[in-house]
């Protein structure tokens, strides 16, 4: 599972010109699901997204999590995070999960975030979307958690 986390001042997602999700200060999460991902990867990623200290304290240090800030989350599915462009000119998406598996795990990810009590908005799974992001910082991280079969390194919690 891969998530691109961007700290934002505001973000919104549109489908066919209609706003379907919008947030103020918070995190924009672009979510990719691999074909080997399980609930274990989803649960780990939920905890990480909620607990990472990506917001500044009064001294300017990254010391506060999205939960501590009471900030908002905009979650957008993005299978292209599993695009592999190493061969040829067209990326391969062989490692991306199929639609049904990806949607099930994506829905579990969103549900896990909502259990925090924070406001969580989403894009439309599988749709062509326009995502508007007003980055703050910018602060952008790529989190990755692979299922044990694809594991190359030791897992860090």
From Swiss-Prot:
Gene giving rise to this polypeptide = dtd
Cross-referenced InterPro entries:
Daa-tRNA_deacyls_DTD (IPR003732), DTD-like_sf (IPR023509)
Q: Which keywords does UniProt give here?
A: Cytoplasm, Hydrolase, RNA-binding, tRNA-binding
Q: Which GO terms describe its biological process?
A: D-amino acid catabolic process
EC code = 3.1.1.96
GO MF, one term, reads:
Ser(Gly)-tRNA(Ala) hydrolase activity
Main location as per UniProt = cytoplasm
Taxonomic path: Bacteria, Bacillati, Cyanobacteriota, Cyanophyceae, Gomontiellales
Question: Catalysed reaction per UniProt?
Answer: glycyl-tRNA(Ala) + H2O = tRNA(Ala) + glycine + H(+); a D-aminoacyl-tRNA + H2O = a tRNA + a D-alpha-amino acid + H(+)
Q: How does it assemble?
A: Homodimer.
Which organism's genome codes for this protein?
A: Cyanothece sp. (strain PCC 7425 / ATCC 29141)
Task: State whether keyword RNA-binding applies.
Answer: yes
Where, subcellularly, is it found? Cytoplasm
By its UniProt entry, which NCBIfam families does this protein fall under? D-aminoacyl-tRNA deacylase
The protein's name in its UniProt record: D-aminoacyl-tRNA deacylase
